[in-house]
Design a protein with these regions (language model features):
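Accessory beta->alpha helical hairpin/"wing" motif in late/C-terminal subdomains of nucleic-acid enzymes
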Residues: 77-81
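Glycine-centered, phosphate/nucleic-acid-interacting loop/turn motifs that mediate DNA/RNA or nucleotide
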Residues: 58
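Short beta-strand "wing" residues that participate in macromolecule-binding interfaces
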Residues: 62
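N-terminal helix-turn-helix DNA-binding core of bacterial DNA-binding proteins
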Residues: 5-46, 65-76
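Short, hydrophobic-biased segments on the C-terminal half of alpha helices
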Residues: 51-52
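Generic serine detector
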Residues: 48, 65, 93-96
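Amphipathic alpha-helical dimerization/coiled-coil segments
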Residues: 1-6, 23-24, 82-100
Length: 100
């Protein structure tokens, strides 16, 4: 039996909240901040920190705008983020050729 190599897990994704963000965006393509906050049952501060980590890794793009006078923050998964998430799932499923 092959030993699972935890070093192949992408640290930018491997965290409960960051994994949840990536899984949600992989299906939805984009979401607004409050939608993610509600779906993931996260606090505003915690979600902001984890989105910044994913943004720094190049896995999500965060766009800020206004809808009338109300600020709107939209989060999109990037092509690099989609590839990284697919590779992460490959590693978890035991496929040795993780996509990068």
């Amino acid at each position: 039996m092959a030993v699972f190599d935890v070093t192949k897990l992408d640290d930018a994704i491997h965290g409960r909240l960051r994994l949840g963000i990536m899984a949600y965006l992989a299906d939805a393509e984009a979401a607004d901040f409050n939608e993610l906050k509600a779906v993931l049952e996260a606090t505003q501060g915690n979600l902001s920190i984890h989105l910044r980590k994913l943004e720094d890794a190049g896995y999500v793009e965060i766009l800020k705008s206004f809808q009338g006078r109300k600020p709107l923050t939209r989060v999109h998964i990037t092509p690099a983020g989609r590839r990284a998430f697919a590779g992460y799932l490959d590693v978890l499923s035991g496929r040795s050729e993780a996509r990068r």
